[in-house]
């Protein structure tokens, strides 16, 4: 845990700074998910590596204590929506950075159609236009649990909410006419 005054970084940087293929893949992820910087990708990558490391550790044991820890890890990943319910421990080893990035509040706001682009979704979250269970969430990197997806919406007094809902209504009307 460390000292409260000395906060530690939550990510590991890439081993080599100028790998062209890695940089190209990171740039694609940044545009696809509307990320601010590559640090957000590295945080997700560190999470994936942490889950994989724990899964490899647990695959080597068959004791009752380890069985409880397996269920705890799989339950956590199922609650967050990274893995489906009833997934095997071996499936944790196949996780990718995109699996983690899909569960961010910013991405889900975009996928639900509350924003036109991932960058706009990020702006709505940061500016306090988005609520989860009636509470403002200002962090675009908030990991949305599986059961919370339907509770995402605009803040009732948000000036943007009416404009976006009107835009979506007009868009749906045009789609039904065609």
UniProtKB/Swiss-Prot annotation:
Transmembrane segments: none
Recorded superkingdom: Archaea
Any GO CC annotation of this UniProt entry: small ribosomal subunit
GO molecular function list: rRNA binding; structural constituent of ribosome
Region of interest called Disordered, as start-end residue ranges on this chain: 1-20
Keywords: Ribonucleoprotein, Ribosomal protein, RNA-binding, rRNA-binding
Classification via Pfam families: S4
Domain named S4 RNA-binding: residues: 103-170
CDD domains in the cross-refs: S4
Bias (Basic residues): 1-11
Chain's role: One of the primary rRNA binding proteins, it binds directly to 16S rRNA where it nucleates assembly of the body of the 30S subunit. With S5 and S12 plays an important role in translational accuracy.
Family, as annotated: Belongs to the universal ribosomal protein uS4 family.
Protein name: Small ribosomal subunit protein uS4
């Amino acid at each position: 845990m460390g000292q409260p005054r000395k906060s530690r970084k939550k990510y590991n940087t890439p081993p080599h700074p100028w790998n062209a293929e890695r940089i190209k893949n990171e740039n694609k992820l940044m545009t696809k998910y509307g990320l601010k910087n590559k640090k957000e990708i590295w945080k997700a990558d560190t999470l994936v590596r942490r889950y994989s490391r724990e899964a490899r550790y647990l695959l080597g044991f068959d004791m009752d204590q380890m069985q409880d820890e397996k269920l705890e890890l799989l339950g956590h990943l199922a609650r967050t929506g990274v893995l489906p319910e009833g997934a095997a421990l071996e499936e944790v080893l196949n996780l990718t950075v995109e699996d983690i990035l899909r569960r961010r509040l910013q991405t889900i706001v975009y996928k639900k159609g509350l924003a036109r682009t991932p960058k706009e979704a990020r702006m709505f979250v940061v500016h306090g236009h988005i609520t989860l269970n009636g509470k403002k969430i200002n962090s675009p990197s908030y990991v949305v649990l599986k059961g919370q997806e339907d509770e995402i919406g605009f803040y009732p007094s948000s000036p943007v909410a009416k404009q976006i809902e009107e835009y979506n209504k007009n868009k749906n009307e045009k789609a039904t006419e065609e």
